[in-house]
């Protein structure tokens, strides 16, 4: 968890949640060529541990794993005007949660109150090269649609979550982050969780 300064007129911070890097992909062909048997030895190598084979040969993870893969990164900017500190903190993030209190026609009001417009939030997301922008803290004068449309002219992969929506932060190889409508993620998890011993009753 990495805090960073946010421009809001008073002392304010945002947070970057940064996951540790993951081991590289397991190279099955390399493991086969080295004589690593299927089973716990391969699991240990995938966890980054060296193993010793029955013939005395020691296999280190770098012999069977590809380059390390980055973990996921979610940045919550909180209230504030667009700033370089947010761009730097959000660089390459999977998800940036950024306020969009106003639309661009209220930019002067946004400056007075040290908030952001949807257009500005989208500019931050584009500059930081994030994967998904989630807009929050909308003024009650908006219903969300116009805010999303304004942001998408700058950064197409923008969502405006509603109460009980969830953002499923998937790894890039599994499709990347996605907005899941209220409760759908929990319902899917419940469907997939079959209690032990009930399989034969269905």
Positions of the model-derived regions?
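Metal-dependent phosphodiesterase/nuclease catalytic metal-binding core
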Residues: 1-135, 142-149, 154, 170-202
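A short, acidic, flexible beta-alpha connecting loop/helix-capping segment that sits on the rim
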Residues: 139-142, 164-166
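Conserved phosphate-binding/catalytic loops in two-lobed NTP-binding clefts
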Residues: 157-164
């Amino acid at each position: 968890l990495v805090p960073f300064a946010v421009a809001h007129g008073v002392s304010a911070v945002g947070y970057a949640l940064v996951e540790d890097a993951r081991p590289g992909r397991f190279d099955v062909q390399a493991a086969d060529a080295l004589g690593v048997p299927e089973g716990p030895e391969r699991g240990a190598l995938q966890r980054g541990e060296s193993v010793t084979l029955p013939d005395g040969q020691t296999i280190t993870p770098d012999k069977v794993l590809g380059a390390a893969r980055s973990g996921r990164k979610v940045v919550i900017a909180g209230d504030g005007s667009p700033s370089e500190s947010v761009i730097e903190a959000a660089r390459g993030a999977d998800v940036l949660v950024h306020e969009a209190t106003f639309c661009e026609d209220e930019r002067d009001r946004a400056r007075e109150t040290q908030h952001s417009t949807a257009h500005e939030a989208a500019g931050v997301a584009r500059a930081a090269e994030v994967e998904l922008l989630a807009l929050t803290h909308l003024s009650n004068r908006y219903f969300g649609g116009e805010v999303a449309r304004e942001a998408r002219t700058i950064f197409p992969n923008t969502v405006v979550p509603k109460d009980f929506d969830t953002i499923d932060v998937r790894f890039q190889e599994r499709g990347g982050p996605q907005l899941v409508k209220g409760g759908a993620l929990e319902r899917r998890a419940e469907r997939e969780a079959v209690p032990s011993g009930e399989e034969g009753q269905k």
